């Protein structure tokens, strides 16, 4: 297995991308990896390390020197290494950041069980994630499951919402897709 590589991409003799890849293995299992790509004005850095059932990963994507997306996560796998039991850390999408933990395997099992998948109280007990406005490091609210009813079919399903500190809430998917209300974008970019 290759443990390192350097990459240079040229177009008409001009360097347009460079990259590096470095990894270590123990008994054929990767214990660390670092990947770096630069394609001006973008830079991407991805790192991964761990052993046993505990692993960590970081990602930073930058435009010039400004981070446009990133994460720092710790993952605990089940002893058989077939599933992730818990994820903790942060996901950064300036001007917001999500900090907290999720019991991933418990949520996957619950969502697969027709009797538990609509139990939003149980699903919410399996995560603790706060939403932070990054420039002031101010907590805006928390992530929580709410029941969504499809207007065409009437079928209910749990969906993630941002519950603001004043008790109001919006669907996370609407906010991230840009179809949330104007107030949601004001909340993300303005200090409260």
Where are these regions (language model features)?
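Short, surface-exposed secondary-structure junctions/capping segments
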Residues: 33-41, 62-64, 87, 159, ...
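Acidic/polar, low-complexity intrinsically disordered N-terminal segments immediately downstream
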Residues: 1, 152-192
